[in-house]
């Protein structure tokens, strides 16, 4: 019997907004909580454990929130940490540095990928009695992804994702030139729609 109340920390990150797998992951989240989280919480409640749930899905899912949640987590020696990710993932071409994937966390920029190994090492260092880290994602080789053992973005970066090259082009356009620009997407008597785009009349 534990001498004081202990905590089971749940950190769940689920991509429920993805165009291809979002609906499946919505169901996955329901199953995760219905058959896994709630079951474990009930079984451990009689042993003095209370659950603390950090549930990131929909618009709350982001690499920044994942990194912050991992780094800010505090626990006691008899606590339990459960990390669960459902979403897209991958690995760099010919990457032999780890067998574990990098997690997309609802976006697709390489600079924002979160290595599952980093999550494991960070949580292991917290000193809890048990750490469980599960990544329900692909681990296939992905062009454009680079090998990394830790997140490569800074702590103050926001949720607007762009590669360094994209940022440099925008900076060049806005800071290296002066003048005025007037643009239209159609000539007189023409519509703006084309190519059966789903973007709408003003974006095609």
Roles of regions detected by a PLM:
Residues 2-98:
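Boundary/activation segment at the start of structured domains
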Residues 48-50, 128, 179-180:
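A generic structural signal for alpha->beta connector loops
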Residues 3, 7, 123-127, 174-176:
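Short, conserved loop/helix-junction motifs that constitute active-site signature segments
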Residues 29-38, 110-120, 156-167, 203:
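Well-ordered, non-membrane alpha-helical segments in soluble/globular domains
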Residues 13-16, 56, 106, 138, ...:
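Short strand-loop junctions, especially beta-strand C-caps/beta-turns
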Residues 131-204:
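Active-site-proximal C-terminal subdomain of hydrolase catalytic domains
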Residues 67-86, 90-148:
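Caspase-like (clan CD) cysteine peptidase catalytic core
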Residues 10, 14, 40, 83, ...:
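Residue-level detector of buried hydrophobic side-chain packing
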């Amino acid at each position: 019997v534990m001498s004081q109340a202990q905590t089971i920390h749940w950190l769940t990150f689920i991509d429920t907004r993805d165009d291809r797998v979002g609906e499946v992951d919505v169901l996955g989240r329901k199953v995760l909580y219905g058959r896994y989280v709630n079951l474990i919480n009930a079984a451990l409640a009689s042993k003095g454990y209370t659950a603390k749930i950090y549930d990131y899905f929909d618009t709350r899912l982001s690499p920044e929130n994942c990194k912050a949640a991992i780094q800010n987590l505090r626990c006691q020696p008899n606590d339990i940490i459960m990390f669960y990710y459902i979403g897209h993932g991958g690995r760099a071409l010919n990457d032999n540095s780890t067998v574990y994937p990098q997690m997309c966390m609802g976006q697709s920029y390489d600079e924002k990928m979160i290595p599952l190994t980093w999550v494991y090492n960070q949580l292991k260092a917290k000193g809890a009695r048990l750490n469980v880290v599960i990544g329900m994602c692909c681990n296939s080789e992905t062009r454009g992804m680079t090998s990394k053992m830790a997140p490569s973005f800074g702590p103050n970066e926001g949720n607007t994702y762009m590669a360094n090259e994209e940022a440099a082009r925008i900076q060049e356009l806005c800071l290296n030139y002066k003048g005025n620009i007037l643009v239209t997407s159609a000539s007189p008597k023409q519509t703006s729609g084309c190519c059966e785009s789903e973007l709408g009349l003003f974006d095609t």
